[in-house]
Amino acid sequence: MLASRLPDVITLGCRLNLAESETIRSLAGSRDMVVINGCGVTNEAVRQTRVAVRRARRDRPNAEIVVTGCASEMDRNAFAAMPEVDRIIPNAAKLLPATWGGFPNHQPPRRHARAFVGVQNGCDHACTFCAIPQGRGASRSEPIGAVVTRIAALVEDGTNEVVLTGVDLTSYAGGLGALVEAILIGVPGLPRLRLSSLDTIEIDGRLFDLVTGEPRVLPHLHLSLQAGDDLILKRMKRRHLRQDAVTMIERLKAKRDIAIGADLIAGFPTESEAAFANTLALLDDCDIVHAHVFPFSPRAGTPAARMPQLRPEIVKERAARLRAAAAARKTAWLKTLLGSTQQIVVEKPGDRGHAPNFAEVHLPSIHPELVEPPSFSSPSERKGIASTGSARMGDTSSAPTVGSVITTTITAATDDHLMGTIA
């Protein structure tokens, strides 16, 4: 059940949405409101946004239900027709104070394991399967100075990990490498900087050197690969070929042990079994250990929706095979981390976190009810709280707080996560 009489922001979709939801939360004031920040990347994401709207109305019958994000941007009429929806806010207006009436936010600051910072929005490319440019518009970037100032304030308030987000992050104006370098120089107290989804074809020399040589840039990259077959990549209107991705990842991993994640689409129109096999083989050829697999979803208005479609059962079956192969690779990779020492940022409820390589680590001897983060009423109360922890099991007075960085020793591996003890 959602809390009553306070704004609640429900987020679906990408990390940029997560970053934007925090801004919305700070602008929404203290009204009886539920904001659904929806996703339109697939038909299923749009369906889930509608489900969230209906659930919000059921749980908060007297609240104002506000919908924003790509789902309502791309299908405004359908959301406007929903009786549960009171207001729709365009993406272009959702971060403007005037949109929310200029109400001050009286909610206590929320503690997060990491801060998502949106630095780029929109996309100038035309991938045939993607409807996101319809919802986000042309590419635009936040000024470097504004980004550095924002991150410096987060670190001052105790943030230990910042994740840079964007629709097409590597198209950041002036170069993503220049931005990363400015952050590292301008915010020397930032311990961990993580990059969200990157396009391999846009990783230039400056960014390559920072990713492979700067310890504060975490050794985990999520890449927008989509497919492993050249003909399918061309029909997707991607800007790279299979070998481009393989070569870039080989170069990266030759310099540093970087965990590779990737977005992959199964069942794209005209995909043959041989073409799918090339995508399946990409898991091994690119050493992918964090895979996001999507069954192809035809989005209205995109060129791919007009191409010859595969039967739904074939799309579903190929996505299942790709997910199973990806899961097996991840399990094998996790086993290689047994006995290692990993620094994790503690996440809610307080008994888990993610290592620099984005492996999830659970601490089975920590009791979550003992490690809930405190509420803060001022920045001075927040300062220093998220510093590296040194808690011992059973010592509740020094249990790690959400957002703190602790050192763990990995003692076991399951199919999808690690288990450890505090070192």
Indicate where each model-derived feature is located:
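Terminal RNA-binding accessory module
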Residues: 298, 305-370, 385-389, 397-423
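Flexible, low-complexity linker/hinge segments
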Residues: 101-112
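Conserved, mostly hydrophobic/aromatic
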Residues: 147, 164, 195, 223, ...
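Cofactor-cradling patches in redox/metallo enzymes
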Residues: 1-96
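A structural motif corresponding to the C-terminal lobe/cap of the Radical SAM core domain
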Residues: 219, 234-347, 351
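Canonical Radical SAM [4Fe-4S] cluster-binding loop centered on the CxxxCxxC motif
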Residues: 112-145
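Conserved alpha-helical substructure of the radical SAM core
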Residues: 136-163
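Conserved SAM/AdoMet-binding glycine-rich loop
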Residues: 65-69, 74-75, 156-274
